[in-house]
Amino acid sequence: MSNTWDDVWASDSDVETERSPDLLKLRENHSKRGYLDGIVSSKEEKLQEGFNDGFPTGAKLGKQVGIIMGILLGLRTRFGDEDEGLSKAYIDAQKELRINKVLSKSIFDPNFDLQEKHPLITKWTDIVNTYCEKYHVPSIQ
């Protein structure tokens, strides 16, 4: 003899036919809610973990992009009218140094670590340093 309190959802097959539609709906809602709560909790943990791991790298790259763009803007403001190549370089840098390109998965290893120097940062640091030398302005270290 089965005790009704052994299974609060009364999921024994012989009891299944006696269940009301409201009880079935309640059980379904609770199951879905539990499933969703579990997924949300897991995603929040993993998202925070990923943010904590990736923030230092992203912040460092963002700072480097800011330095590159700031120097290019200053040079373009001062010398852009007479140097068409400099103006074009600034526009190209705006396109190439967008966040989705700087933080592209293809640039990182499977653990999302940079193996060497960032190719776009290296490229644009070299370009900026060339213009800095041309106009006798301190270059990026």
From Swiss-Prot:
Its main location: cytoplasm. Signal peptide: none annotated. One of its GO terms (biological process) is protein maturation. One of its GO terms (cellular component) is nucleus. Keywords: Cytoplasm, Nucleus. InterPro entries: Essential_protein_Yae1_N, Yae1-like. It is found in: Cytoplasm; Nucleus. It comes from the Eukaryota. Disulfide bonds: none annotated. Residues 34-74 are annotated as: deca-GX3 motif. The complex LTO1:YAE1 may function as a target specific adapter that probably recruits apo-RPLI1 to the cytosolic iron-sulfur protein assembly (CIA) complex machinery. May be required for biogenesis of the large ribosomal subunit and initiation of translation. May form a complex with LTO1. Belongs to the YAE1 family. This is Protein YAE1.
